[in-house]
Curated annotation (Swiss-Prot):
InterPro entries with a match to the protein in the record: GET4, TPR-like_helical_dom_sf
A Pfam family that the UniProt record links to this protein: GET4
Biological processes annotated in GO: protein insertion into ER membrane; root hair elongation
Keyword Cytoplasm: yes
Name used for this protein in its record: Protein GET4
Signal peptide residues on this chain, from the entry's feature table: none
Purpose of the protein: Involved in the regulation of root hair growth.
Oligomer and partners: Interacts with GET3A.
Length: 324
C-alpha cells in the first residue's frame, strides 16, 4: 500500500485517543500499550508526525495517571523518538508536553533502609519498595536522557535544555534509593539554577556520611569552573558558606573547602604558578577523589591554556557522558 493511500485511509486521531482511553479504563493495560505503539507507528509511516505525537503523548499521560510506570515510560520514550524522526524543534509547546509527562511520574518516599532483619516480611517489603523505586528512576532517566539529547540536536543549547537537566537532577536526588551525587551534579551544573542546586547540597549536608559534604561541594564548584562558569561557582560557594555558618560550622575548617576558596580567588587573575602551588599544597585533600584532579586539569586548560596529557580522559569532554 502506498504512503499516500495510507495517509488518506487513516481516521481522525481523536477517534484512536478516545478508543484507547476506554481500553485502559477497562483494565487492558498491556493490550492498550501494544495498540498505542502499532497505531502511532502507522501515522509515523504516513509521515503524519503531529498526529502520532498526539497519540503517544495521550497514551503516556493516561498510563502514568493509572500508575502504570513501565507502560507510560515506554510511550514517553517513543514520544521523544518520534520528535527526532519528525525533526521537531525544541520549542515551548513540545517542552510543555515533556513537563506534563514528567510531572505524572510518581514520587514515592523511599522507605528507611533500617528494618528488623529478623522479620522476613519487613525485609521483603523493603526489597520490593527499593526495587520499585529503582525501576521508576530508570524509566524516568531513560525518558529525560532522550529528551535532553533531542533538545541538544534540535535547537536547544549544545548540552541540552537546562530545565530538562534540572528535572532529572531533582528526581535522581529525591527518588533514587542510592544517591549518586556525581551524576546528580552533572545535571544541576547545566540546569542554570544555582539557587536550587545550592539548596540541594545544603540538604545533602544534613543527611550524608561524615566527609562526604565537602567532597560534594568541591565537585559542584569545580564542575562549574570546568565549564568556565565563574559566576555560578562563586554563588555556590558563597551560598554554602552562608548556610553552613549555622548548620555545619565545621565545614569551613575542611582543607578541601579552603582549597576551593583560594582557587576561586586565584582564577580571577593570570596566576598559573599560584594555581599549581595550590594543587601541590592541597594534594592529599584533592586526591580523595580522582574526579577532582580531572576537573582541575580541565580548569587549567580552560583558564591557562595548559594542555591535558589525554584530553579524552576529561569527564566533560564527552557529550555522551554528560547525558548520563
Amino acid at each position: 500500500m502506498s504512503r499516500e493511500r495510507i495517509k488518506r485511509e487513516l481516521p481522525p486521531v481523536q477517534e484512536h485517543i478516545d478508543k484507547l482511553r476506554k481500553v485502559i479504563e477497562e483494565g487492558n493495560y498491556y493490550g492498550a500499550l501494544q495498540m498505542y505503539k502499532s497505531i502511532s507507528a502507522r501515522y509515523v509511516t504516513a509521515q503524519r508526525f503531529s498526529e502520532a505525537l498526539d497519540i503517544l503523548f495521550s497514551g503516556a499521560c493516561i498510563e502514568l495517571e493509572h500508575g502504570l510506570v513501565n507502560c507510560g515510560a515506554d510511550l514517553a520514550i517513543l514520544f521523544v523518538d518520534t520528535l527526532v524522526k519528525a525533526k521537531s524543534p525544541c520549542n515551548d509547546e513540545t517542552l510543555d508536553r515533556i513537563r506534563c509527562i514528567f510531572k505524572l511520574f510518581p514520587r514515592v518516599p523511599v522507605p528507611p533502609h533500617l528494618v528488623d532483619v529478623s522479620d522476613d516480611e519487613d525485609v521483603q517489603n523493603l526489597q520490593e519498595s527499593l526495587g520499585e523505586a529503582r525501576s521508576r528512576v530508570e524509566n524516568l532517566t531513560s525518558f529525560l536522557r532522550a529528551a535532553i539529547k533531542w533538545s541538544a540536536e534540535f535547537g536547544g543549547p549544545r548540552t541540552g535544555y537546562p530545565e530538562l537537566h534540572a528535572m532529572l537532577g531533582d528526581y535522581l536526588y529525591t527518588e533514587c534509593p542510592e544517591l549518586d551525587m556525581v551524576r546528580i551534579s552533572r545535571h544541576f551544573v547545566r540546569a542554570e539554577d544555582p539557587e536550587k542546586f545550592a539548596s540541594m547540597l545544603v540538604n545533602f549536608m544534613g543527611r550524608c556520611y561524615p566527609g562526604e559534604d565537602d567532597l560534594a561541594i568541591a565537585r559542584a564548584v569545580l564542575m562549574y569552573l570546568s565549564m568556565g562558569n565563574m559566576k555560578d561557582a562563586n554563588f555556590m560557594m558563597d551560598e554554602i558558606k552562608k548556610q553552613a555558618e549555622t548548620k555545619n560550622p565545621e565545614l569551613s575548617e575542611s582543607d578541601l573547602i579552603q582549597f576551593i576558596s583560594y582557587l576561586l580567588e586565584t582564577l580571577q587573575r593570570d596566576a598559573l604558578p599560584l594555581f599549581n602551588m595550590l594543587r601541590v599544597k592541597y594534594k592529599s585533600s584533592i586526591d580523595r577523589d580522582q574526579l577532582l584532579n580531572e576537573l582541575l586539569d580541565e580548569i587549567a586548560e580552560r583558564f591557562y591554556g595548559v594542555q591535558r596529557k589525554n584530553p579524552l580522559q576529561g569527564m566533560f569532554g564527552d557529550i555522551f557522558k554528560m547525558m548520563g
